[in-house]
Amino acid sequence: MAYPFQLGLQDATSPIMEELTNFHDHTLMIVFLISSLVLYIISLMLTTKLTHTNTMDAQEVETIWTILPAVILILIALPSLRILYMMDEINNPALTVKTMGHQWYWSYEYTDYEDLCFDSYMIPTNDLKPGELRLLEVDNRVVLPMELPIRMLVSSEDVLHSWAVPSLGLKTDAIPGRLNQATVTSNRPGLFYGQCSEICGSNHSFMPIVLEMVPLKHFENWSASMI
């Protein structure tokens, strides 16, 4: 989860988020190099006589500033396309969970089980216990097995929502009449928090998401107790 005054990304918990973090660092390095080069050239122009006000044509320079940006864009596009493909690809999911957005709560249905569905509302501030997080705790957590590919089907019953869990690299739009798919895989157990990331009305800020990733045996015990 995020902390006050945090500057970096949340700790990566899924392979996708690890790839996104690496891509962020890769792109940031390119931006830093370009910015440094531009500032260096500007400083040279302001402090030296390396200017040619009468030069109207420079074929070599035009060739360089055409080819170099193309190479830079390719270096950014190739890893980006690879990650996009990874985010859309899912083979043989161990579990499928259908998520529906409402004003202003989430409902979940485990399609592999009969009658395993529930609504998830934010716990009001006055009802929080010591140590619980304001605006992030829910009455029913989404319990999922760790280290297994899980398919999330996301849609909405009313207006546009967005189901997002940053530490897992997840952000999927919930659109009425349409099912969007996302892949959830966690490398470790724990509680992972998210929120609706699409302005959906007056209580948009009160639609938290809590995923509880547990070992498979614990998940089987939980699902048996819920049915």
UniProtKB/Swiss-Prot annotation:
Pfam families the UniProt entry points to: COX2 (PF00116), COX2_TM (PF02790)
Q: Which GO terms describe its biological process?
A: ATP synthesis coupled electron transport
| Residues in the Mitochondrial matrix compartment per record | 46-59
Write down the required cofactor(s): Cu cation
TM segments? 15-45, 60-87
Q: Per UniProt, where does Cu cation A2 bind?
A: C196, E198, C200, H204
For this protein, what does the record note about how its cofactor is bound?
Binds a dinuclear copper A center per subunit.
The positions annotated for binding Mg(2+) are E198
Cite the binding residues for Cu cation A1.
H161, C196, C200, M207
What do the Gene Ontology cellular component annotations say?
A: mitochondrial inner membrane; respiratory chain complex IV
> Which PROSITE patterns does UniProt cross-reference here?
COX2 (PS00078), COX2_CUA (PS50857), COX2_TM (PS50999)
Query: What superkingdom does the record give?
Result: Eukaryota
What ranges are annotated Mitochondrial intermembrane (topological domains)? 1-14, 88-227
Chain's role: Component of the cytochrome c oxidase, the last enzyme in the mitochondrial electron transport chain which drives oxidative phosphorylation. The respiratory chain contains 3 multisubunit complexes succinate dehydrogenase (complex II, CII), ubiquinol-cytochrome c oxidoreductase (cytochrome b-c1 complex, complex III, CIII) and cytochrome c oxidase (complex IV, CIV), that cooperate to transfer electrons derived from NADH and succinate to molecular oxygen, creating an electrochemical gradient over the inner membrane that drives transmembrane transport and the ATP synthase.
The entry sums up its family as follows: Belongs to the cytochrome c oxidase subunit 2 family.
| Quaternary structure (record) | Component of the cytochrome c oxidase (complex IV, CIV), a multisubunit enzyme composed of 14 subunits. The complex is composed of a catalytic core of 3 subunits MT-CO1, MT-CO2 and MT-CO3, encoded in the mitochondrial DNA, and 11 supernumerary subunits COX4I, COX5A, COX5B, COX6A, COX6B, COX6C, COX7A, COX7B, COX7C, COX8 and NDUFA4, which are encoded in the nuclear genome.
What protein name does the entry list? Cytochrome c oxidase subunit 2
Instruction: Supply the source organism for this entry.
Output: Sundamys muelleri
Supply the gene name.
Answer: MT-CO2
